[in-house]
Amino acid sequence: MSNGKRLMSTAHDSDLKIVEIKAFPTSFPVKPEDSVSLGVGRAVKRDAIIVKVTTAGGLVGWGESHHGRAPGAVAALVNTTLRQLTLGMNAADVVGVWKKIYDKQLASHGMGAGTCLAMSGIDQALWDIRGKAVGWPVYRLLGGVSRPIPAYAGGVSLGYQPPAELIEEIHPLLAMGYKAIKLRIGDTPKRDIERVTAVRKAFGDALVILTDANTGYDVAAARAAMPGLEANGVGWLEEPFPAQDYRSYALARSFGNVPLAAGENHYTRFEFSRLIEDNVITIFQPDVSKTGGITEVMRIAHMASAYKIQCNPHTSMTGINMAACVHVLASIDNGGYFEGDVSKNNLFRDELVSTPYTVDKNGCVLPLEAPGLGVEVDEDFLIKHPVIEGPSYV
């Protein structure tokens, strides 16, 4: 079928009426041998919330809401208030659905970040439906083209292991094609720099090294670590402090020339506009499962483009989010890296969905070509892996 004929076969508005929204909180335990220590603690389980939106015509869209370390609570918000707000609306009216949730739930007395997490999964599912309705992958709907996007080895990996173990873990990642890796810091400045230095010496200047403190630093630690990070040519220092600690970020800017990165814990374009005004965080990392979905990440990216700020979307838990990130990166002019998930035995990447991306020999990924987000969801997985309440990190 030609592209023109395919566009002519779009569903009628009545077929696109939203008739059901269902969020599925899901978890699996992390084996001790697969657990990684980060600035936020040691992982004991992985959580996710999968959102399913169904239309009157039988189209089904899938999205991921970040669990917010309270998966049952976020899923309940989707299944109650947000469901009631959006039932009966046109699934193609993605902006209208976003605005209604914002006006009625988020803008005033509406649980703030929790609502952003919940609405993000709905938004992704609606984009999935839009693509399926016209037979296009999401990146084409967003105005993008298929092009290689550089990836770095990230996810819940490369934590506080001894330097020799880190080096051993990195070798197979480079064999997979990755040209860039992200090391977890936020332990102590001394041990952090020892790890970064060991990796730099082992692999030379050709390897791009990025770092993520997962909010584990205070101002003194960031000041102590910055010279070593700069000496090793680190590409960025991600989230040294909690997202709303604007004063510490402002102070840290004077500690050296390593760019500060953040955004996975900032919500909606309104919080990102503050980052632009402050001119301290110069690499943005919005998460399509946290900050308001694909719709809002595109707004953030376009806003950042006017200020020459690069966007490197943060990857969440599942292959749904990962596929969505690649679609976004293929559709913006200020995109940077895709965060490849190299965590061990991630069932949300390997079993819940079909393959969300493939890293080629040059360390790049391409957006999926199937209609919508391009991934298929195994609904039996959701039955077999019910939510495990409690903290994800200890």
Predicted regions and their residues:
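Flexible C-terminal active-site loop/helix
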Residues: G4-K5, D13-V19, A23-V30, A48, ...
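Hydrophobic faces of well-ordered beta-strands that scaffold small-molecule active sites
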Residues: G61, A151-G154, I181-L183, I209-A213, ...
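Shared catalytic-loop signature of beta/alpha-barrel
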Residues: T80, P227, G233, Q244-C364
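Glycine-rich, aromatic-flanked loop segments that form ligand/cofactor-binding clefts
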Residues: M119, D123-G159
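Metal- or metallocofactor-binding catalytic centers and their adjacent structured scaffolds
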Residues: E20-K22, T54-A133
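Short Pro/Gly-enriched beta-strand edge/turn motifs at strand-loop
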Residues: V30-S37
